[in-house]
From Swiss-Prot:
It is an enzyme of class 1 (oxidoreductase). Gene3D superfamilies: Medium-chain alcohol dehydrogenases, catalytic domain (3.90.180.10), NAD(P)-binding Rossmann-like Domain (3.40.50.720). The gene is gdh1. This is Glucose 1-dehydrogenase 1. Its EC number is 1.1.1.47.
Length: 351
């Protein structure tokens, strides 16, 4: 079978290789991936920054964002059927003993992750995974279900922000929202906040006001600010940082008002020396800072439900977030996206 692979920690080893077709073991299923999303994590692995193959193997199959069809069941699988369309979660505990609903809190070194650490991913014609980590996709969301994995991170972060913000004091009533970044995470955060009935939302990026990103922000009722030209005005009750830039994360805290909640959703590899004085001020003004990376199956379920709602509320807007689609044979193009792109997807087979 064809598979998009790398030799982990070897820069630029990306290649389409012929790999043996796997067979499902007990409690596992064989999947036929339909679409696989591409993100910055994949780029980092391709650049040799991190990643690990399954034990005893040289190659790692990429792809942790996927929607797939169940095509074969291993023994004792009773929660899905052949023909079901599903989204697999990413993380699998190895020595971690937390329940399935909390595996996103497993300590580092106690888990494996599809397409990242010790488990093959889904950028291939066939893949196996544990059946209990699958979320069924209703037919009305199949064409956008590839967005579920990045959306799960957003769901987790926003859910934590709203619940923990309220837990501090019942009268907390956030209104103004700032989302920094108009990539896939930022746009999905905008979608979720609009579904949660937030009306005063500002999204910032560096693209022109006539760009696709700016148009999509305005299309569902938010304000777009090009930070190359204009400044962000005022304080916000909730700030969602989705750029992955250390300086932007630092800047996000400057725009957080008293009693506000900041949600950091980026992977911050560009470490820089920063003045911590503003952070000390945050504590004195009752600010709450939350980070979220991996998400549990509950957040995936929330994501699928919100994709269904968003298609009803916003029509074709959600699908417009997928700006680049390539075939498996054209895989290299998926990992080279420009500033105007939002989400790149490899279409493994037709829907």
């Amino acid at each position: 079978m064809k598979a998009v692979t790398v030799i982990p920690l070897v820069k630029d080893s990306l290649a389409l290789r012929d790999m043996p077709k796997p067979s499902p073991k007990r409690y596992q299923v064989l999947l036929s991936p339909i679409e696989v999303g591409v993100c910055g994590t994949d780029k980092d692995i391709i650049e040799g920054r991190y990643g690990a193959p399954p034990p005893g193997e040289e190659y790692l199959i990429l792809g942790h964002e996927s929607v797939a069809e169940v095509v074969e069941l291993g023994d004792d699988v009773d929660n899905v059927s052949v023909g079901d369309i599903v989204v697999p979660t990413v993380r699998r505990p190895t020595t971690c003993t937390l329940p399935i609903t909390e595996v996103d809190y497993c300590p580092r070194g106690t888990y494996a992750e599809h397409g990242i650490w010790y488990l093959h991913g889904f950028a291939t014609e066939f893949a196996v995974t544990d059946s209990q980590y699958l979320v069924k996709v209703p037919k009305e969301a199949i064409d956008v279900a590839v967005l579920t994995e990045p959306l799960s991170i957003v769901e987790k972060g926003i859910d934590l922000a709203l619940r923990l913000g309220k837990a501090r004091f019942e009268s907390w009533s956030p209104r103004r929202v700032l989302i920094m970044g108009a990539g896939p995470i930022g746009m999905l955060a905008l979608m979720v906040m609009r579904l949660r009935d937030f009306a005063d939302i500002t999204v910032t990026a560096t693209r022109p006001y006539d760009s696709l990103k700016a148009k999509l922000v305005r299309e569902i009722g938010a304000t777009y600010v090009n930070t190359n030209i204009d400044q962000i005005n005022g304080d916000f009750d909730i700030v969602i940082e989705a750029t992955g830039s250390t300086s932007a994360a630092y800047d996000a805290l400057r725009h957080l008002g008293a009693d506000g909640v900041a949600v950091l959703l980026g992977i911050y590899l560009d470490s820089k020396n920063v003045n911590i004085r503003p952070l000390l001020d945050d504590w004195r003004r009752n600010k709450l800072i939350i980070g979220a990376t991996n998400a549990s199956i509950g957040a995936f379920e929330m994501g699928v439900a919100d994709l269904v709602k968003a298609k009803f509320e916003f029509g074709g807007w959600v699908r417009k977030l997928i700006t680049k689609e390539v075939t498996l044979d054209e895989y290299e193009y998926a990992y080279n996206w420009g500033h105007e792109d939002i989400k790149s997807v490899i279409q493994i087979r037709s829907l």
